[in-house]
């Protein structure tokens, strides 16, 4: 039975005044964050704590995933000065851990991998003590693009599977096996580089399917995992098929750790970069 009303544990309030200063800084540096673009429910909490996931390569995606709130249309050319601005923000905010992600840019020959590498290099120069986590697209499975990201030596490299294979029709242009291969290629190129992936729950998946995905992730060397509740950004997006209670998320965390994951964040409001610094502490 599909639940259409949000339960009481999903009533987090967003307080714009709590993160006005952070938004001013980002605006001054002409930077985007996935927190803003995806209307993340954790934005007040994270911005108040001076945590953000920077969105490079613009804020327009070339794919049409039916669950995502990032703008979809023909993207503009990316700004080559973006890595320097991101590095300046990381330095000014004195971040101990930073997450860098992007929309999918199938229009670019390397999918944007080169700009990821340049951003890592710029942050290393400006803030050498900052741990760098990347959340990359699939680069259409291109080995050279993935290798360019790995060669930049981030501390964590993530790629989200998002959902179970049966539901991949909601991920326009994506392929479950290709996404698994991205994580495998990263691990094969540098086994020391910690890999991470995430799933949204409440899309219609079964528990058996969830744990089959976790088995698949462990098989390709994935170390870190995030599990969170899918919340439809609007009525025009893919509808929520069910709400997972907090105690079930807790159960999934314990079971995933027992399976062999090094660190698991699991809860209704967990997103890929939520409490990201905690993953680095487990490395």
Curated annotation (Swiss-Prot):
**One of the record's GO molecular function terms:** metal ion binding
Family (UniProt): Belongs to the radical SAM superfamily. Lipoyl synthase family.
Q: What is this protein called?
A: Lipoyl synthase
Its subcellular locations are: Cytoplasm
**What EC number(s) would the UniProt record show?**
2.8.1.8
Among Pfam families, the record links this protein to: Radical_SAM
Q: Which PANTHER family match?
A: LIPOYL SYNTHASE (PTHR10949), LIPOYL SYNTHASE, MITOCHONDRIAL (PTHR10949:SF0)
> Which gene name belongs to this protein?
lipA
Among Gene3D superfamilies, the record links this protein to: Aldolase class I (3.20.20.70)
Query: Which species does this protein come from?
Result: Geotalea uraniireducens (strain Rf4)
What are the annotated GO cellular component locations? cytoplasm
């Amino acid at each position: 039975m599909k639940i259409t009303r949000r339960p009481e544990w999903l009533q987090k309030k967003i307080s714009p005044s709590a993160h006005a200063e952070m938004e001013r800084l980002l605006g001054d540096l002409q930077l985007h964050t996935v927190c803003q673009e995806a209307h993340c429910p954790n934005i007040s909490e994270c911005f108040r704590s001076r945590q953000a996931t920077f969105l490079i390569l613009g804020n327009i995606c070339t794919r049409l995933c039916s669950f995502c709130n990032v703008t979809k249309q023909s993207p503009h050319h990316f700004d080559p000065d973006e890595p320097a601005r991101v590095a300046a923000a990381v330095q000014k905010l004195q971040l101990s851990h930073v997450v860098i992600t992007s929309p999918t840019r199938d229009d670019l020959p390397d999918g944007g991998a080169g700009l990821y590498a340049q951003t890592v290099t710029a942050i290393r120069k400006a803030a050498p003590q900052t741990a760098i986590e990347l959340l990359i697209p699939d680069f259409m499975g291109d080995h050279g693009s993935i290798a360019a990201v790995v060669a930049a030596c981030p501390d964590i490299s993530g790629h989200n599977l998002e959902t179970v294979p049966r539901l991949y029709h909601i991920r326009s242009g994506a392929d479950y096996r290709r996404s698994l291969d991205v994580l495998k290629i990263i691990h094969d190129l540098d086994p020391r580089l910690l890999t991470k992936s995430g799933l949204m729950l409440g899309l219609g998946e079964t528990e058996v399917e969830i744990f089959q995905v976790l088995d698949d992730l462990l098989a390709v060397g994935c170390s870190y995992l995030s599990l969170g509740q899918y919340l439809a950004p609007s009525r025009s997006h893919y509808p929520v098929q069910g709400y997972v209670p907090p105690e079930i998320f807790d159960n999934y965390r314990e079971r995933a750790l027992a399976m062999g994951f090094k660190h698991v964040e699991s809860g209704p409001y967990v997103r890929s970069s939520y409490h990201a610094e905690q993953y680095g502490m487990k490395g």
